[in-house]
Amino acid sequence: MNTFFHIAGTASLSLAVAPATLAAPVWEIDFNKGLETARDGNRTVMVEFTGSDWCPPCKYLRSTILDSPEFANYAERNKLVLVELDFPRTPGKISKELMKEREDIMRRYGVTGFPTVMLMDGTGAPYARIVGPTKTAPEYLEKLTKAQDLKNSLNGEIAVARKLSGSERAAALAKALEKVPAELQGYHKELIAEIMASDPEDRFGFGKKEKEARMMAQQSEMLEQFYLSQRGKIRGEELRKSREEAEKILSSPDLLPPIRLKLNKFISDSYALERNYPKSLEYLKSARDSDPGSKESSRLQPWIENMEKIIAREK
């Protein structure tokens, strides 16, 4: 798992310095309980994904910013529901069951770096993601305030849109959703359902996107199960059979590009283990070409260039 440092309200919301006597904010460690608390009071949930005992940027964020009186005052004034999801490495610090539960949440929200903070409503729909700390607490609070301003603007536009009907309602709701960063829009399932209900002809494409999202979830789960079933098979006949299984999955015409990329990369890695670098390079290129234009595809180019150098040296 990658880390940040690579293992890697309204505008008037106060940034005022807190009194020294202000009590430290309480952090919930149960994600679902935090959402429930937020729903009951229509509050914002601030979720921190952290590695408290091994991640230097996480320690800096906590000691310099989240434990500061400025943040305590901000959290109190804005009634934030604070949730800490810690991923410690100290043996026995948390149970395996709790670690798995948190890893599932991390995957659900696409968290790939520590520390990551996400701001969301009580339904679990996020509208902001902050990766890494800032140098000072006031700088971080500015980021939080901008996120809260976005939320308030979003809610205002939704309220206006709900007074409309038919295609006008769908158009206004879709425009409101555009305020949310593109990578977070898909989590706003209730809002998307509202848009689709007012857009039976799917002019805004959310019906198609929802279908693709369901397929991605199903295929991602299938891929996860495949990885688990192949764990430890790193040599000889077992490795060959693993490739055959991956090839069978790749033969499906409905396989989505990101999944196709990962399977090609899996096969490439298996050939690399056997030092069959030409075949490894072949599948690396297939992986890159499976999802052109994606970040994952662009990240493979250095691998391809390195493999080409290895092959050239062995000639």
Give residue spans per PLM region.
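Thiol-based oxidoreductase modules, predominantly thioredoxin-like and allied folds used
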Residues: A24-I29, T50-G51, T64-K100, V111-F114
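Loop/turn elements at helix/coil->beta-strand transitions in domains of secreted/extracellular proteins
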Residues: G41-V45, N78-V83, T112-P115, G122-A125
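Non-catalytic, surface beta->alpha helical segment in thiol-disulfide oxidoreductase systems
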Residues: T64-L66, D104-N152
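Non-globular targeting/processing and membrane-anchoring segments
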Residues: T145-K315
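Short active-site neighborhood of thiol/selenol oxidoreductases, capturing the structured segment around
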Residues: G41-C55
